[in-house]
Amino acid sequence: MPAAYRPADCIIELVFNEDGHGVDFIFRYCNAEMATIEGVPVEEMLGRSFYEVFPNGDKKWLVSYADVALNGTKHILHDYSPEVDKCLTIHCYQPEPGYCACVLQATDP
């Protein structure tokens, strides 16, 4: 099944600063596929922020995730993730305002 038609692997709630910029996100839903890709058990992600789970995490994803959460836009992101040492393709859409749902595909670098 094409990634764009699969159910979300995770749903994240964006955290914004007083200027309205995305500064972090909280894992509100994660499935087994997400845990496999991230190499972290679901229970260690749920309810925690990205930077709690990945303290040295890259902020490059935040702008796109915030755009989805605030404006309802859709994005397809392609980039290397050093946190998991994989090349990721992430299909993002807004399930409801303030949230970003992601469907992930991972390949080895």
Where do the model's predicted regions map?
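PAS/PAS-like sensory domain cap-loop motif
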Residues: 17-22, 34-45
